Amino acid sequence: MSVTASTLVLAAPVDPDLSGFGDDPFWLILLKGVAVFAFLLLMTLFSIVFERKVVAKMQQRVGPNRHGPKGWLQSLADGAKLMLKEDLIPALADKPIFILAPILSAVPAFLAFAVIPFGPEVSIFGERTTLQLADLPVSVLYMLAAASLGVYGLILSGWSSGSTYPLLGSLRSAAQIISYEVAMGLSFVAVFIYAGTLSTSGIVESQSGRWYIALVPSFVLYCISMVGETNRTPFDLPEAEGELVGGFHTEYSSIKFAFFFLAEYINMVTVSAIATTLFLGGWQPPPIPGLSGLDHGWVPLIWFVLKLLLFLFFFIWLRGTLPRLRYDQFMAFGWKVLIPVGLLWVLVIATFRVYQKDVDDRTPWLIGAGVVIGIMLIVALLDPGGAKHQRELEEAERRKLAEAPSLESIPWPPPPPGGAHHRPAVPAGTSANGSSTVIPADPPPRQES
């Protein structure tokens, strides 16, 4: 995709007409709701098998190949297996909350998809309707709030388990989502300023001919934040197997564990759909000559799904290539790098918006500033701990060892008066008073006649 300087123009405030979303018949609203629910379930089943096959290819393995054609029904087999597993509840668990927590984790993942536009207006059984369940004047804020509600299920699951490892995992998850939710919110601000609206349908319409991926810092900031938001590698610290066994879902089994698994992959699909809507034009075709006519009917739904799969592959690629960060590196990267860079980029965007007079002259400077800040973010991600800081720590440790006192200079307590007393040697098999301590041997085995 090529974005010229003249196409990236700050939009005037847009007030999209949202009155049509309440005019659909009830059966059509119900049909679209069921379709969104089925789409999320199918994408989850597909994502699980797709991830296993891609990671197997990266590791030069075969991957799942037993259930269904070439193993593509492996997710159904795993789901049936989990449903038939024994459902165990720890004795020290708070049972009502322990049972409710997986549901609280999965439901918000479905709610965020209510305002995602899948396509333009189409005809369904003679009724004209948009391929979107609902829209709001603050749809993006609604998605941000719905995505953050899932942390309550994680916290309650760790607290109600009555175990140390789940509690530590839930606390990590809460700190992680709070930290990266701020950076994710900052990545949205530039999109709001350019689109002039918080409505998802309005943002997609404003990207006709120009995608907001040109806002490089916002795009990079969101891509990093969405990985931290979903607890995926390299930010899967709440589920660190080497430290916390399984994290917040250590004590869960059977269908309750499947709910957590379902919530994780639905969250992946949700944040990928948000990225597609805000930065890749949603259901709009790529701004390439010759594709402008493929933006009506059911064809835009295909564009949306292809962009969604691109972000899902990005998640899988990170899992197969990057190691897990340390917890201190992860939190320092969020608070010391992502949030300051996000604030700096918002300041740059707001400055250009306020003092904008000649868009064609100022837009190249805006794109240049965005590229520089985006490169800073990528470099910081590749070196989260800071190589210079790490060398300083190692040098301080070497100085500390060099300055440590030797054994001769350590003041030792004086020996007891009269010198050390040594007990006389005692023959083996006897105690200090001379009695035998030999354990009698076992009797010989009976000989069968």
From Swiss-Prot:
Belongs to the complex I subunit 1 family. NDH-1 shuttles electrons from NADH, via FMN and iron-sulfur (Fe-S) centers, to quinones in the respiratory chain. The immediate electron acceptor for the enzyme in this species is believed to be ubiquinone. Couples the redox reaction to proton translocation (for every two electrons transferred, four hydrogen ions are translocated across the cytoplasmic membrane), and thus conserves the redox energy in a proton gradient. This subunit may bind ubiquinone. One of its GO terms (cellular component) is plasma membrane. Its EC number is 7.1.1.-. It is an enzyme of class 7 (translocase). It is found in: Cell membrane. It is a multi-pass membrane protein. One of its GO terms (molecular function) is NADH dehydrogenase activity. It comes from the Bacteria. NDH-1 is composed of 14 different subunits. Subunits NuoA, H, J, K, L, M, N constitute the membrane sector of the complex. PANTHER family: NADH DEHYDROGENASE SUBUNIT 1 (PTHR11432), NADH-UBIQUINONE OXIDOREDUCTASE CHAIN 1 (PTHR11432:SF3). One of its GO terms (biological process) is aerobic respiration. Keywords: Cell membrane, Membrane, NAD, Quinone, Translocase, Transmembrane, Transmembrane helix, Ubiquinone. Signal peptide: none annotated. InterPro entries: NADH_UbQ_OxRdtase_su1/FPO, NADH_UbQ_OxRdtase_su1_CS. It catalyses: a quinone + NADH + 5 H(+)(in) = a quinol + NAD(+) + 4 H(+)(out). This is NADH-quinone oxidoreductase subunit H. The chain crosses the membrane at residues 26-46, 96-116, 136-156, 177-197, 211-231, 259-279, 298-318, 330-350, 365-385. Residues 396-449 are annotated as: Disordered. Pfam families: NADHdh.
